[in-house]
Amino acid sequence: MNGTEGENFYIPMSNKTGVVRSPFDYPQYYLAEPWKFSVLAAYMFFLIIAGFPVNFLTLYVTIQHKKLRQPLNYILLNLAVADLFMIFGGFPSTMITSMNGYFVFGPSGCNFEGFFATLGGEIGLWSLVVLAIERYVVVCKPMSNFRFGSQHAFMGVGLTWIMAMACAFPPLVGWSRYIPEGMQCSCGIDYYTLKPEVNNESFVIYMFVVHFSIPLTIIFFCYGRLVCTVKEAAAQQQESETTQRAEREVTRMVIIMVIAFLICWLPYASVAFFIFCNQGSEFGPIFMTIPAFFAKAASLYNPLIYILMNKQFRNCMITTICCGKNPFEEEESTSASASKTEASSVSSSQVAPA
């Protein structure tokens, strides 16, 4: 055994020398130099001061501008809400624990932070599933008379929360557990031990199958079919140029969101799966710390992608910030831009069925 397991923790270091201590009671500077903990604290501070404004602005701008309240935009707003849950529910505690060198909030605080981190990540993943299904239905048209409306959007939002809770809540009630990971300054699902007392092995398998593999399979299937359909439609000119351009813009934005999600979360999932499949193997604390903290950047990239790639939302945001005026919008292109970006809205209600 190359680690030390306690009642509520697992530290990736053997206690042969007797230096290993509980991450809830003592600084963990034997795992890494103090300056590395300071770097983690500074990183979390950056995510807080950068992530809160852009996610809050996403919500505020959509509330202020009625034309942004399109059905599928509700899913994008759902991502912003999930990001804010992560920012308020986990980031401050992670920053404070990194500053102190150990998890000062105890096992209860670890459960609290682990729950919100898992909940936010899963809402993000299942939101991308809903977006992928919407793109598939709208562009590929397997159901010719289907129109994505507000009711479908609310159902999609509800699905994301139900599935996220089905993943984040069980460790709080005895199926698996949340423990400090890596340098012991942030908490997540216990991938490190089998822990038969809480049936940890079955939960981790359930999580990887139901809450990671299946969602990604759905996403890849939808976009695989979508790419083929877009190419066929372009070749046959089945849609107007304006409609094709609008659908391409929306699809491109959502695909980039999926790629960004994979960049942020795939390293974490891969390392966690490796650790789980190699119980007791030797690995350093940095091995899990880097992907775990890198995954937290997910709270920042989604709103940035949305702002940068959705011209209608970007114009509304600039108008809100500039107190009702958009100094960057040319007068002669106002009419054309408005019609184009309105068509680019992530709402299938504006796309005529075949």
UniProtKB/Swiss-Prot annotation:
Pfam families: 7tm_1 (PF00001), Rhodopsin_N (PF10413). Residues 62-73, 134-152, 225-252, 309-354 are cytoplasmic. The modification N6-(retinylidene)lysine is found at K296. Coiled coil: none annotated. Residues 334-354 have a biased composition (Low complexity). The keyword DNA-binding does not apply. A lipid is attached at C322, C323 (S-palmitoyl cysteine). Keywords: Cell projection, Chromophore, Disulfide bond, G-protein coupled receptor, Glycoprotein, Lipoprotein, Membrane, Palmitate, Phosphoprotein, Photoreceptor protein, Receptor, Retinal protein, Sensory transduction, Transducer, Transmembrane, Transmembrane helix, Vision. GO terms for biological process: absorption of visible light; G protein-coupled opsin signaling pathway; visual perception. It is found in: Membrane; Cell projection, Cilium, Photoreceptor outer segment. A motif ('Ionic lock' involved in activated form stabilization) lies at residues 134-136. This is Rhodopsin. It comes from Scyliorhinus canicula. The lineage of its organism: Eukaryota, Metazoa, Chordata, Craniata, Vertebrata.
